[in-house]
């Protein structure tokens, strides 16, 4: 049994949420093929984060993946990770987690103030811009509206209550839970880390857990925590910490694989010297990803031998993205999937050849593709991070065991984040 289970819809989300626990000394493993193996029911582990790879799945398929993960890995505390920009199957996955965990109440707080994500008056924003206008492909800014299709009742916890602290949150949550047939989803405002701390501690008090602020434990409600990497920093894990240590490899060399086409990632790529970047032809990557990746690996091996660091991507500007999508439309292929395969093939060839000791993986889909290519089903978080939302880990099993891995969601980081990752490793 796990002390805590994190269920995320993509790999970078599982990583940055798990980091919220690892940074406080908890032993955190992140599993890619989380639904494929049934664990030993007599063993007790600390924190397991499972990537269901369901962000782009049909809602029913995503819900089933979440249900299977929660049922496969029983845990004293369940944390349903959702994207901090509310992409993916948010409502269907939260509903599935509520049912599978047997929760009376779900505390939904996707804010991540350290990365510019905030919620006020129920409306979610990115660096002050309403979510629907922030360029993430999400049409709704109001968290309550996003959850409106839930099979459960949706309530709102306003900022004024949250700002009053954990005891006020506990009381408000108790009232909301008592005023409706359970379960109930509570959409929470938060604009600072202190607000997220109050939400976590108030909910834990309602669940009967002791909290450091002195909020009075008042019951035995089963609480499902729903949030991004922000709330995870403040949720308490039951049981004693059991740190998990995997010795990192001493091999030199760092390879960055950049699959995200988020505008912020493109800006970060522009800050890296052209001499370090191998760009795959995006149209060729869609037509023949394996061959394109093989050719890219040859160039990467030469560069790593000379410089000990390299970056591979298939998109440095909007023109590259359009080229890939044009060929995909002609051939009936899926551009993102084909390009991801090409990047993973290039990375796999470079790792087999130059054998860099460290990887930087930007974008959840390409991170999963690369690690799958390496037969690396599980990562151990070290508790260290290059920046907010950019955690460090080590491959915990498989042929690549010991390889250091840093992951970054496409929308996270500053202009120098990719460069800083290369420097840090």
List each language-model region with its residue ranges.
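Cap/lid and interdomain-hinge subdomains that line or gate substrate/regulatory clefts
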Residues: 2-6, 27-31, 61, 70-75, ...
